A protein has these predicted regions:
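Generic N-terminal targeting/processing segments that precede catalytic cores or assembly contacts
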Residues: 1-366
Length: 366
């Protein structure tokens, strides 16, 4: 039963959806990294439900940093973030009625009935709040050494955005100040319409996200079990709702030939670059100096307002369930900062392993 990820830089998550609080512990960070409270709050606001596209559960996310920060900088000791739960409604849930495609029955089998089942408990998307708070600190550390991360919605239902350019830095920079995680206004409007249409039908909708990492040096990662792709996949699949991942051209590679998919190399200002980026910035599990790019499949939110067939696993009986709680018609908008955060965790861990604990502190002028 493990809730910790990482080797050199680790993150532990704790708490439940309707418990007193949710939180995170970051360990292995270099001392002296600046902690930007404004950026942390901005990242939390990107994850927070704010519109008709999201759940009606409104949480202020008034975080507290209990340890690991002194006078605005990391101390190098475990950094603990706690976010109180201030708006719970446990009466919306009935223990024993397994919500289709939720973790209710699986959790009951694993924890023998001792799990906190209210609102999904430890499996709830609520636990991504401290993940995003911790991720804000990690993203700031990466920015200090010239590494940026951005995620947009590539597809939601039948609505599409354009993909990142092969050199994605300008697109990633544009996302930092965007109100909606799309690269074009037309896509933002079409995606919003798709989500609202699902809500009107008491249904939900999924989609595809695309994440880009710019500025990573070549040579980061390991060749086999700790490859960049392996670790990013591990972290990404920790997010509830993610059901698939591909890097670069991914599954489109099966439709062509090597002459179509290979990335030709050339020199540019004394640096090795590729003409295209169909391999997503990774060869042999190791970064090649180009942008790391991957897409994730995000399933429709399983909580919908239509009657569904299920079981009462306490009684051993078939049952029908209509969910009346406060839920998202799509999580794909709110999942973008979560993807940025787990990506930052993997990268900080790998960079620290490759270059040492103080590498990330170089960006802070230390």
């Amino acid at each position: 039963m493990k809730n910790t990820f990482g080797q050199a830089v680790t993150l532990t998550l704790f708490g439940e959806s309707h418990g007193a609080a949710v939180g995170a512990v970051l360990d292995g960070l270099a001392p002296g990294l600046p902690v930007d409270g404004d950026f942390l709050r901005r990242q939390l606001s990107r994850r927070r439900p704010t519109t008709a596209l999201d759940t009606a559960r409104q949480e202020p996310d008034n975080y507290q940093i209990l340890s690991g920060v002194f006078q605005g900088r990391t101390t190098g000791t475990p950094l603990t973030i706690v976010i109180p739960n201030e708006n719970t409604r446990s009466g919306d849930y009935t223990y024993g009625l397994a919500r289709p495609s939720h973790a209710d029955y699986a959790a009951y089998c694993k924890y023998h009935g001792y799990e906190d089942w209210r609102g999904g408990g430890h499996f709830s998307g609520r636990v991504t709040a401290p993940l995003v708070a911790a991720g804000a600190i990690l993203l700031s550390a990466l920015a200090g050494v010239g590494v940026t991360v951005g995620t947009h919605i590539l597809r939601c239902g039948d609505a599409w955005d354009r993909p990142f350019a092969d050199r994605a830095a300008a697109d990633v920079a544009a996302l930092q100040g965007a109100d909606f995680p799309a690269l074009t206004d037309e896509a933002a409007q079409a995606i919003s319409a798709a989500i609202l249409a699902a809500r009107e039908r008491q249904d939900s909708v999924g989609g595809i996200t695309q994440t880009a990492v710019c500025g990573l040096p070549a040579g980061v990662g390991e060749p086999w079990f700790d490859s960049v792709e392996s670790l990013l996949s591990h972290a990404v699949f920790s997010i509830g709702g993610v059901k698939g991942i591909e890097f670069g051209g991914g599954f489109s590679a099966v439709c062509g030939y090597g002459s179509d998919f290979n990335d030709s190399l050339r020199m540019e200002n004394g640096r090795v670059v590729t003409e295209t980026n169909r391999n997503g910035g990774v060869n042999g599990g190791i970064t090649n100096g180009m942008d790391v790019v991957f897409q994730c499949a995000v399933k429709p939110t399983p909580s919908i307002g239509q009657p569904q067939q299920t079981v009462d696993f306490l009684r051993g009986e078939d049952a029908e369930l209509t969910i009346h709680g406060r839920h998202d018609p799509a999580i794909i908008r709110r999942i973008c900062p979560v993807l940025d955060s787990v990506t930052a965790l993997v990268l900080c861990d790998l960079l620290t392993q490759r270059f040492g604990t103080d590498y990330l502190a170089k960006g802070a002028g230390l």
